[in-house]
Amino acid sequence: RASLPASIRRTPLLRLAREASEVGKEKLQLKAECLQITGAYKPRAAFAVINALSQESLSKGLVLTSSGNFAQAFAYAGSYGRIPIVVVMLDTTNPYKVDMARNFGAEVVFCGTDALSRQATVERIASDRGMTAIDTWEAQPIVAGHGSLGLEILEDEKEIQTVLVPVSSGGGAAGVAAAIKQSRPSVRVIGVQPERANAAYVSLKQGEPTAIDYWETIADGLSAVRPGEYPFRHLKKYLDEIVLVTESEILEAVRTIIFRAKVIADPAGATATAAFLAGKVETSRRTVAI
């Protein structure tokens, strides 16, 4: 955390009452990373990666593939340090996400419509331009950078009993879980995934990273078809469990966050809250949802 720049916000914990009778005695708080610079927690990891690289590597730039939050995170971190950033995206990427990456200073390179072509394009650009390729699924500093989230929660809520964290490829959840369990083992850390994008859930059941055949969820930020090898080891070691939520439960969480907390979270950002609101976890415990 000490290496993160001042522009990375220490986001607040927002109390969320499910109904009027809970006001003043809320069990649920939201770690509002939707208020983070770029609108998500990924810049924490992007800066951790950059801080781990040599000045020579940074001067030549970084190349990665991302369809959303990591693209914006590295674009922002790169502009902060005047580091060239190239992001490889599919032709079908949401135009808003393309524009946001460009607005933060990244060069966007399209690679067609085949998802398997993304990594090959990254490797070609890295070779042609002498850039450093970043694997956002396996880079160890990414897990460490996300750990800052867990530490902030422990510092800001001394009586916390449960932390709910959304899971996709696993880097964010792995970092949060490792930081919390190493600091305060009694706190339960529970991962949350959409029922229709449950690769990490399946992988924990199988005991190894396992790919799912497809995903279909409104929470497209949690659409990894397989967890990364490195983060999976942390998930297996530190997560207490993963629970699943339905599409309707995710949408209801988005609605509740808007009306009760007065902030806007996208479906991926509302997924952890959905587990609490739908009773997928013990709701009598003091809980933080990321």
Specify the residue positions occupied by each region the protein language model found.
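PLP-dependent amino-acid enzyme catalytic core
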Residues: 1-290
